[in-house]
Amino acid sequence: MENNCYFVCSRSILKSCDFHSPNPSSSWCYDTDYLISMINGNNMFDTMSIYICTDVIPFFTNDILPKLKHSFYLVSGDSDATVPHGHIDLWHGNRYPLKEEYCLEILKHPKLIKWYAQNCILEHNKIHQLPIGIDYHTISKDPNKFWRDSEANEGSSPKFQEMILKNIRKEMIPFYKRIPKIFVHMTNYTHRQDDLNLIPQELIEINSNTMPRTKVWKEMVNYSFAFSPWGNGPDCHRHWELLCLGCIPIIKSFGDNKMFKNLPVLIVKEYSDVTQELLDKTLTQFKVMNFNYNKLLLRYWVDKFSSPPSL
């Protein structure tokens, strides 16, 4: 089960909440039965944690929020939509933007303790960025996914996938002893090519081969840096894979960036800011810094919405 994983991962966060969908579907705005059951049941309590898909926020605001009488943590994600303004129900033919007023309505609710949101670009003292982490659920749900190295007879469970990651970590060397270039792995990168073109080509090492994720992971640990553009939302599973594998992801800024504070991440306003001088300076600075690698762990984040509020 994902909620027993070591590293932070999207579905592990979901399954660690007190109330969550028993059959989650990413970016699905109609997954609401468990919320209705929660309201109609008699098992709510103070400081409970409620997980919702980002796409469910309008329903939650209109139909669930007014009925909440207990203090609660809200945790949202399992979607590419930004909070706010992202397009929700993106994959099911009914695309529309997530209005900021829904988010503000939640934030002013007197029983809200804090809201932890994936792909969050809204700044408010009660809302905090939450990582999407590693993706274990795709291969677990579909063992035939090309990401899985079937030739190596890899298992598909979250536990097995995490074992692969841990084994690669055992062999990796520090980022400052690696090839000081920017690793790029993209097989279908038309919409990201503009960003990549802004980086001097002599600084990058491109691998455009389609290959299982394990082989990509083994490539990552050879390099100090990696190009890590936004996914369909600003956060991306690749960001967290790179961090777990000791590589410095180069990421365009979004929101308040506090999620990446005290982690070895090179945040730029534009990829045109990337130069040899910047890479050299970053390696020199990061080599002597003490980072908080606990932020890569599931427990670090779950503890934030599992403990009672501070008095």
Residues covered by each model-derived region:
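Nucleotide-sugar donor-binding catalytic core of glycosyltransferases
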Residues: 1-267, 272-311
